[in-house]
């Protein structure tokens, strides 16, 4: 399974990517929305893990841009925003699931 992890916080991005790779997932990662859009335009992924608070292009814009051309690739939002309104906005924009930070890798893998 090929994943794209989009997370601006370097320590968290590296930690999650490392754990995913050890679990057998082929994982690309990037730290801003602009790089994410470039990767999404050039590559195919089985799952996108998307933070909302990103530099250059925010996560919600990345999601809406992806959904204009790709309705199939599952997107799981990983965000510190944990209000119900944030979750509803993300799901309404086309995310398949929403996981609030902090999270445990076992919870991520279960989804």
Over which residues does each language-model region extend?
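N-terminal/domain-start alpha-helical segments
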Residues: 1-111
């Amino acid at each position: 399974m090929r994943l794209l992890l989009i997370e601006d916080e370097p320590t968290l991005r590296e930690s999650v990517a490392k754990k995913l790779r050890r679990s057998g997932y082929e994982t690309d990662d990037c730290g801003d929305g602009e790089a994410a859009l470039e990767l999404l335009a050039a590559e195919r992924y089985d799952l996108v893990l998307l933070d909302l608070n990103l530099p250059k292009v925010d996560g919600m814009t990345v999601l809406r841009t992806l959904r204009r051309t790709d309705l199939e690739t599952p997107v799981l939002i990983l965000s510190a925003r944990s209000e119900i309104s944030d979750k509803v906005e993300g799901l309404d924009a086309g995310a398949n699931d929403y996981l609030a930070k902090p999270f445990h890798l076992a919870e991520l893998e279960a989804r």
